[in-house]
Design a protein with these regions (language model features):
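Basic, Lys/Arg-enriched alpha-helical interface segments
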Residues: 2-58
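Enriched for short, Lys/Arg-rich terminal
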Residues: 66-69, 73-92
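Structural motif corresponding to alpha-helix initiation and N-cap regions
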Residues: 55, 65-66
Length: 92
């Protein structure tokens, strides 16, 4: 199964990385981005590992050790990454 990022999700990752780099360090930002990519990469093999989403036809993956949530949709041949959200953000 392939992973496809929406423009919104890509923007979310950029904002997360920029925030961490500004308020922490570049290496911390790269580490968080790598952890997010690794967790999302596992969705290609285990697309149902996240819980049922709060919006119909979505799933939500809580990232272990990070305060972030991945909102995604699964189809026959693709996992579509819809959003990356901080756990404190109101969703939906």
């Amino acid at each position: 199964m392939r992973i496809r990022w929406t423009l919104t999700a890509t923007g979310d990752l950029t904002q997360i990385s920029d925030y961490i780099e500004t308020h922490g360090s570049g290496s911390a930002a790269r580490g968080v981005a790598l952890s997010i990519h690794v967790a999302i990469g596992l969705l290609a093999k285990f697309p149902m590992q996240g819980r049922a989403g709060r919006i119909a036809n979505t799933r939500e993956l809580v990232l272990p050790g990070l305060p972030y949530l991945v909102v995604y949709r699964v189809s026959e041949d693709e996992v579509q990454i819809l959003r990356l959200l901080h756990g404190a953000q109101e969703w939906p």
